A protein has these predicted regions:
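Compact alpha-helical subdomains of small soluble proteins
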Residues: 57-113
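Residue-level marker of intrinsically disordered, low-complexity segments enriched
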Residues: 6-8, 19, 52, 78, ...
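Generic cytosolic/nucleocytoplasmic N-terminal low-complexity/intrinsically disordered segments
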Residues: 2-3, 17, 36, 105, ...
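Short N-proximal segments of mature Sec-exported proteins
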Residues: 24-75, 95
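Classical Sec-dependent N-terminal signal peptides that target proteins to the secretory pathway
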Residues: 1-24
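Processing junctions and N-termini across compartments
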Residues: 17, 40-41, 90-91
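Unusually extended, aromatic-enriched hydrophobic runs near protein termini
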Residues: 1, 15, 52, 94-99
Length: 113
C-alpha cells in the first residue's frame, strides 16, 4: 500500500513539474559574431605587442597564446571554421595594423582544443 502511494506521488510530481529542455542556440549569426570577436582580440594583441617593440615572431607567439587562453573553454569552438577565422585575422591585420606580409600559415597554432 505504501509502495503504491509512493509510486503515485512520484508519478504525479513528474507529470506536473516536468519542464521542457531546449537545445543550445548555435545560429550562424552567433558563430559569426564569436569568430569576429576572436579575430579582433588576436589583431589587437598582435598590433599592440608589435608596436611595443617586440619582434613579429614574439608578437605572434604572444597573440596566439593570449587568444588561446581567453577562448579555449567556449562551447562554440567545436563549430568554428578555422579557415574563415584565419582569413579574418589576416584581413584585420592588413586593415588595422598595416601588416601586409602576414601569411595564413603562421596561424597554424591557433586552435582551441
Amino acid at each position: 500500500m505504501i509502495k503504491r502511494a509512493f509510486t503515485i506521488f512520484i508519478l504525479t510530481l513528474l507529470l506536473f513539474f516536468n519542464s521542457p529542455v531546449y537545445s543550445l542556440d548555435n545560429s550562424s549569426k552567433t558563430l559569426e559574431k564569436y569568430t569576429k570577436k576572436i579575430s579582433n582580440k588576436f589583431t589587437r594583441t598582435f598590433c599592440n605587442t608589435s608596436k611595443f617593440g617586440i619582434s613579429y615572431e614574439g608578437a605572434l607567439a604572444f597573440a596566439i597564446g593570449e587568444t588561446n587562453k581567453e577562448f579555449k573553454n567556449n562551447k562554440l569552438n567545436k563549430l568554428i571554421d578555422y579557415s574563415l577565422l584565419k582569413n579574418l585575422i589576416v584581413n584585420d591585420l592588413e586593415n588595422d595594423c598595416q601588416v601586409y606580409d602576414f601569411t595564413i600559415s603562421k596561424l597554424e597554432n591557433l586552435k582551441f582544443n
